[in-house]
Amino acid sequence: CISRYEKSPSVKVVPQDMVEIPAGNFRFYTKRDPNTLDPFIAFPDFSDTVDISMPRFFMDRYPVTNIQYKQFLTQTSYIPNDTINYLKYWSNGSPASGTEDLPVVYVNPDDAKAYAKWAGKRLPTEQEWQYAAQGSDMRKFPWGNMMDSTKCNYNLNFSTPVGRFQNGGSPFNVMDIVGNVWQMTSDVYDNGSYYFTIIRGGSYYHPTQSIWYVTGGPLPVDHPEMLLLIAPGLDRNATVGFRCVKDSE
């Protein structure tokens, strides 16, 4: 891993629209279903189990939405160097009416980090994301060990406004953490052949009988996926968003 942790300004009190992730012991383990592996790309083996003592931190209750990202643009006038595919679903610099509360997509890691820095936050590490989604008991989904289509966006074939599935929270009440859109982490790798970041959670889109798309649908919280970083415009797509974390004093 060549890029993981960038400290944010720290606070004591839970910030607005974030939840407290208390300190605790956590067994970090990742697993990919061998049936979902792309035969053309050698995915790295992250199957080691590591016991970690997690510090207290804060995480966004929901993925960053279109309206939140619009506020960032209004206040900063941020424009990426490469605008290919940037906010592709928007028109004239704004999200379409009725989509304000959808997770923002068609942003790449640099776009997400720019937002996070403006907000006084940062992207989560893989370990932070999984601990916030899973807690300390190694459950497979935020709510337990069995998939439940009433608790997340399960094959609806479109993204949904954040907060729609209020019964699908994690042990710490982090919402929309599986399904809807993939979420970026700060973990970036270079294995000598590929430069990639790790995304988590799955998305609403579930391709059938195709090896050219990553596995879709809501996925277990211990499932990592590799997002190849090829070029800024190509690193943006319709099913990857992000949420932020903030350090605690």
Q: Where on the chain are the PLM-derived regions?
A:
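Intrinsically disordered, low-complexity PEST-like regions enriched in Ser/Thr and acidic residues
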Residues: R4-Y5
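Periodic aromatic/glycine/histidine/acidic cluster detector
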Residues: P9, A231-P232
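A short glycine-rich, aromatic-capped structural motif
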Residues: S10-L87, V107-D110, G179
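Functional-site microenvironments in short loops/helix caps that host divalent-cation chemistry
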Residues: I21, R27, L87-M226, G233-A238
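Acidic glycine-/aspartate-rich tracts in secreted/extracellular proteins
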Residues: V64, S77, S136, D187-D190, ...
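Short, structured beta-strand segments at or near domain termini in extracellular proteins/domains
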Residues: A238-E249
